Each structure stands twice: as structure tokens, then as C-alpha cells.
């Protein structure tokens, strides 16, 4: 693994400002999320400062492939970009889930080059996740200049990616809000969220929303431990309430694995256009496991009777409900952090292009230092640090396993330390 590089890294020699770039196309690809409009606007505003025109290439990679047949493109002039807000999620440029390598056209890269030449576009700023990044590498290898601005709400790339913080905030909001209906009906509430094979958004959103249990792909589930925690917390919460009211919330990442380490799929969901199985059904699976254990537990029958809830044949165990906020966690508003990061990512993608760089991923900045990574390193999957999970286990959160011990090492920091803001 190479370390993130800055603009003085000899791996990518600086050629000085590349002023043969007169027009830049902007593409947003894959799933939408918060922060993308910030990337679009940051790219356009920096390009304007450099006397470069920018154009939105609509519909992601599908639009790039079809440029040759496109009549005109929207130029992102200062007036045009003033018409949309970086505070809104989604992308003014539009998306599609199309991977260039999947297009069955042997002349597809030449077709793309001809389309770019038609509009005089010299380089591309492309914002997306790992699949998008792999296409950036392909385009670069075919002589198309492009820089990758990392975007994925899943946070499974090596650098921070725009969309992650916005999604975490929305998950936290929904988890917290659902407690009102859960408590009213004394329900066990299961919230299934996006994240694919990494549990970052479930982990961080679940903590911020004060979920009781958080199940992520990095930890195969011990159902006995989940049920032990649920039974203890749920019964205690209701019995200590003067009106016998309480709820128990579980946040489930869609890429959850069973005890054998195999992902849980709803096979009827099929595959997406990138060829990935659609991860669905984890929340439903968890609900089934919990319901089976509640139904087989005589203590639960006694608890229901003691608290005045039990009705033979009608209401014998607590209700277990699965909620899937789905695209609501992508939609709506962009967090302040994603708005800041997205603007910087777009602006510095232009700066990287003007330094003669291509086929790389913007990975961050500090003052006047811009960092980037080899794109193949940047799109390697990054998973939840289980040492951080251990910390939150000490605070009472259940992660579907027996709680580990936590003995931290303590070190003093001095000087100007790195922080979010």
C-alpha cells in the first residue's frame, strides 16, 4: 500500500500548470448522496478562476458514452451554478449506474474520445466510489485525462469520501425519531441501512442515534449474545417505566454476515448494473431470528403477563418491526462537513489536472498542500476499525458479540494537531 502523496511526490512528476486545458467535463456517477453538488460547484468555481470552462456531462458514464449523439451540454457558468445549492443532496449533473467496461462495444473508448472532441473537452473531473474509480483508471489508460473526487456514502474507500457524513447524520436522525413510535407500542425496531460490505454508516449513525444494538458486516453475528442483550435491556426499560413503555432499537448494515461469515442476501433482489448482488433482506432476517427467540422464551410470556400486555392468541410476544429508510438516507440535505469537503475536492481536482496529473484520486488537503493517491490504492475497501467498536461496547452498545476488554494506550499530543475543523 502506498501512502497518500502530495504534489511533490515523484511518482507523479509535476509538469507545471497545464494550460492546454480549456474545457473540463464534470461527471457524477454511481449512487447519489449528499455533497455532490458541492463537488460540482467547487470544480466549476475553481475552473472559472483559471479561465477554464466547465460542462455538466449528464447521466454519469451513460452520458459520457453517448456524448457523440448529444446535441449540446450545459455550461456551468457562474450564473448557472448559482441556481443550485451545495446544501442539497443529489447531483445537478445527474447519474446512472453504468460501468464503461460492461458496455458491449469494442470501440467504446474511441467513441468516448470522439464525443469529448466534439465538445472540445480536454479533461474530466469524475466523482464516485470504487466502481467509478476503476473506470477512471480505465479512461486514463486510454489517454483520457481525468481526476477522481471520492464519493460514497458507504465510506469504504481509503480516503474520506463525500456523502458519508450526510448519510450518518440522516441515519442518526431516523434511529432517534423511530423511538417515539417504538416506545408507544413497546416494539423492537430494526432499521436496515445501506453500506454494502462495510459497516461505517451503521456504526456511526447507530451510535449517534443511540441505538441499543448495531450489527455490521465486520462482525459475524452471535444471535445468543444479541438476544441476551435485547432481553436484558428491553425488559428492564419497560419494567422501570411508570407507564410500562419502552423500545429496543437495532441498526443493521445491509451487508450483514451470518455466524459462518456468509453475507445475507434476498436472492429475489437480483443484481445491479455493476454486476453486484443487491444487498437486501438483512433487516428481515434479523427480525425473524429475534421473533423466533422471543416466541420460544417462557420468560417473555411471563413478562408480557406481568406488564399487562399479554392476550392469548393475539398478543403473546413483543412486536418486531423492520424499517428500511432506503434512499431517504441519500436524499434531502448535505451536512456542513460534506459541503466543505465536496467544494475542496472539486476545486483541488482542477488543481491536480493543472499540475499534469491524471488517473489519481484526490485524498485531502491541508492549507496549500493537496494530497492524492494512486487510484488503485484509493479504491481498496476500508472496513470499520474493531478497536473503536470495543470502546463503544464498554458504553453498553451491543455489536452482536461477547464484549471485548478495552485497555487503551495513552499518549500526549503537542503542537497543531489534525482535527475535522
Annotated model-derived regions:
Residues 54, 123-128, 134-138, 145-146, ...:
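Accessory alpha-helical/coil subdomains and C-terminal extensions
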Residues 266-421:
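C-terminal non-catalytic interaction/assembly regions of soluble proteins
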Residues 29-32, 57-63, 97-98, 129-132, ...:
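Short, ordered loop/turn segments at secondary-structure junctions
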Residues 23-31, 91-96, 122-126, 188-192, ...:
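Short glycine-rich or small-residue beta-strand-to-loop segments that form or flank ligand, phosphate
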Residues 20-68:
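N-terminal phosphate-binding or glycine-rich loops at protein starts, especially the Walker A/P-loop
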Residues 33-43, 64-65, 109-110, 124-137, ...:
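Short glycine/serine/threonine-rich phosphate/pyrophosphate-binding segments
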Residues 67-124, 131, 162-176:
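Glycine-rich oxoanion-binding loops at beta->alpha junctions
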Amino acid at each position: 500500500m502506498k501512502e497518500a502523496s502530495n504534489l511533490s511526490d515523484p511518482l507523479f512528476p509535476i509538469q507545471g500548470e497545464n494550460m492546454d486545458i480549456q474545457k473540463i467535463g464534470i461527471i457524477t456517477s454511481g449512487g447519489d448522496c449528499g455533497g455532490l453538488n458541492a463537488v460540482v460547484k467547487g470544480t466549476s468555481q475553481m475552473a472559472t478562476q483559471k479561465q477554464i470552462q466547465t460542462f455538466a456531462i449528464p447521466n454519469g458514464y451513460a452520458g459520457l458514452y453517448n456524448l457523440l449523439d448529444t446535441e449540446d451540454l450545459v455550461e456551468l457558468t457562474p450564473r448557472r451554478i448559482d441556481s443550485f445549492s451545495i446544501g442539497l443532496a443529489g447531483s445537478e449533473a445527474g447519474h446512472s449506474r453504468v460501468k464503461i467496461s460492461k458496455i458491449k462495444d469494442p470501440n467504446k473508448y474511441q467513441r468516448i474520445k470522439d464525443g469529448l472532441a466534439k465538445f472540445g473537452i480536454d479533461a474530466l473531473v469524475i466523482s464516485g466510489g470504487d466502481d467509478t474509480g476503476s473506470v477512471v483508471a480505465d479512461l486514463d489508460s486510454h489517454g483520457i485525462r481525468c481526476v477522481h473526487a471520492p464519493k460514497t456514502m458507504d465510506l469504504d474507500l481509503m480516503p474520506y469520501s463525500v456523502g458519508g457524513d450526510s448519510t450518518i447524520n440522516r441515519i442518526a436522525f431516523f434511529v432517534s425519531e423511530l423511538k417515539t413510535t417504538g416506545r408507544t407500542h413497546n416494539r423492537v425496531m430494526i432499521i436496515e441501512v445501506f453500506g454494502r460490505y462495510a459497516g461505517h454508516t451503521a456504526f456511526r449513525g447507530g451510535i449517534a442515534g443511540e441505538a441499543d444494538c448495531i450489527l455490521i458486516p465486520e462482525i459475524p453475528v452471535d444471535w445468543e449474545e444479541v438476544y441476551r442483550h435485547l432481553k436484558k435491556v428491553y425488559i428492564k426499560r419497560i419494567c422501570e417505566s411508570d407507564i410500562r413503555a419502552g423500545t429496543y432499537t437495532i441498526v443493521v448494515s445491509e451487508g450483514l454476515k451470518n455466524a459462518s461469515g456468509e453475507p445475507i442476501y434476498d436472492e429475489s433482489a437480483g443484481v445491479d448494473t455493476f454486476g453486484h448482488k443487491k444487498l437486501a433482506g438483512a433487516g428481515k432476517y434479523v427480525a425473524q431470528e429475534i421473533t423466533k427467540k422471543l416466541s420460544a422464551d417462557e420468560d417473555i410470556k411471563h413478562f408480557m403477563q406481568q406488564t399487562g400486555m399479554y392476550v392469548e392468541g393475539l398478543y403473546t410476544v413483543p412486536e418486531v418491526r423492520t424499517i428500511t429508510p432506503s434512499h431517504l438516507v441519500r436524499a434531502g440535505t448535505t451536512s456542513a462537513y460534506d459541503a466543505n469537503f465536496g467544494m475542496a475536492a472539486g476545486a483541488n481536482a482542477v488543481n491536480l489536472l493543472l499540475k499534469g496529473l491524471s488517473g489519481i484520486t484526490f485524498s485531502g488537503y491541508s492549507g496549500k498542500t493537496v494530497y492524492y493517491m494512486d487510484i488503485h490504492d484509493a479504491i481498496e475497501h476500508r472496513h470499520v476499525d474493531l478497536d473503536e467498536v470495543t470502546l463503544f461496547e464498554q458504553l453498553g452498545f451491543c455489536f452482536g458479540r461477547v464484549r471485548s476488554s478495552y485497555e487503551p494506550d495513552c499518549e500526549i499530543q503537542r503542537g497543531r494537531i489534525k482535527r475535522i475543523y
